[in-house]
Amino acid sequence: MGLDITQKKRRIALGCEGSANKLGIGVILHEGDTSTVLSNVRHTFVSPAGTGFLPKDTAQHHRAFFVRVAKQALSDAGIRIADIDCICYTRGPGMGGPLASVAVAARTLALLWGKELVGVNHCVGHIEMGRTITGADHPVVLYVSGGNTQVIAYAEQRYRIFGETLDIAVGNCLDRFARALNISNDPAPGYNIEVLARKGGRVLLDLPYAVKGMDCSFSGILTRAEELAAQMKANEGKGTDGEPFTGADLCFSLQETVFAMLVEITERAMAHVGSNQVLIVGGVGCNERLQEMMGLMAADRGGSVYATDERFCIDNGIMIAHAGLLAYETGFRTPIEESTCTQRFRTDEVLVKWRK
């Protein structure tokens, strides 16, 4: 995996991610202009069907499993503590409780082992890992997850946000709709919606489509989808053909509509910046139907779509280690007294010194 590393030296970082319900710890090696994933361990907090994950419960999960996951990551990597150059952690954005739990743990390791700390922007971690794994050079980035929906492109050492959700994230829309149908959260509600959607498609239900330039909105479509779910449960829901629709039809219709919105705003950004590449990152980026729809659009423009598998698109520690080590190699450090976390941390706040 090729990287643009200014200082050609062997360096190792341990990354800690815990901004939502995934606790991830990974170890990465940068050597010359290449990088190697040494370990990538993850443990997920799964809440009961019909519910979401609360910050306090998720934070408790991260505290309970941090030591176990860290030991496994070090064991898988086959390294000594002395080999590690820095400890990287997710500074934000994310849920306050889980972020704080992992920040405290990372700070403890840094003090215990005498290592320097690097606070990392969660989205920048996704982007840099995606670029490295796929080889995408100068893509428009679609960042889609449970907490974020942004269309991004790089310019002048910043990841510039060209469009975003005006209310809730697309992943949050899907997760909350899953509760309306009591869909399991194991392994993830979005994945289970994707599986159900493949069984639907007899009818495409009419749902709100809200795009404003390169911005979009998902709260209205969620409300309408929840209303249709309630009608279906009461045996009152009928499609355009007058026949009752199923939960699979609802999942299909929701996916098709929200993904069409994402494709539209991404294509608009591609035209604006003159790019023929799309890189999809974030948990929702694992969805094969989203990748397929984006691929059709990109092909019409003579372009390409890049995406990673679940090891890297779902929240993980290795992306934090990677982005943190890139920053570390430019001289960036996070002093212990400033090693806080924040629920709001814009992608374009980060100075991307490692890129030209």
Swiss-Prot record:
What EC class is this?
Answer: transferase
Q: Which SUPFAM superfamilies match?
A: Actin-like ATPase domain (SSF53067)
Q: What is its main location?
A: cytoplasm
Cofactor list: a divalent metal cation
Task: Please give one Pfam family short name.
Answer: TsaD
Give the location in the cell. Answer: Cytoplasm; Nucleus
Q: Could you tell me the keywords of this UniProt record?
A: Activator, Acyltransferase, Cytoplasm, Metal-binding, Nucleus, Transcription, Transcription regulation, Transferase, tRNA processing
Listed GO CC annotations: chromatin; cytoplasm; EKC/KEOPS complex; nucleus
Q: Which reaction does it catalyse?
A: L-threonylcarbamoyladenylate + adenosine(37) in tRNA = N(6)-L-threonylcarbamoyladenosine(37) in tRNA + AMP + H(+)
Q: What is its EC number?
A: 2.3.1.234
Assembly mode: Component of the EKC/KEOPS complex composed of at least BUD32, CGI121, GON7, KAE1 and PCC1; the whole complex dimerizes.
Write out the function statement from the record: Component of the EKC/KEOPS complex that is required for the formation of a threonylcarbamoyl group on adenosine at position 37 (t(6)A37) in tRNAs that read codons beginning with adenine. The complex is probably involved in the transfer of the threonylcarbamoyl moiety of threonylcarbamoyl-AMP (TC-AMP) to the N6 group of A37. KAE1 likely plays a direct catalytic role in this reaction, but requires other protein(s) of the complex to fulfill this activity. The EKC/KEOPS complex also promotes both telomere uncapping and telomere elongation.
Protein name listed in UniProt: tRNA N6-adenosine threonylcarbamoyltransferase
Q: What is the lineage of its organism?
A: Eukaryota, Fungi, Dikarya, Ascomycota, Pezizomycotina
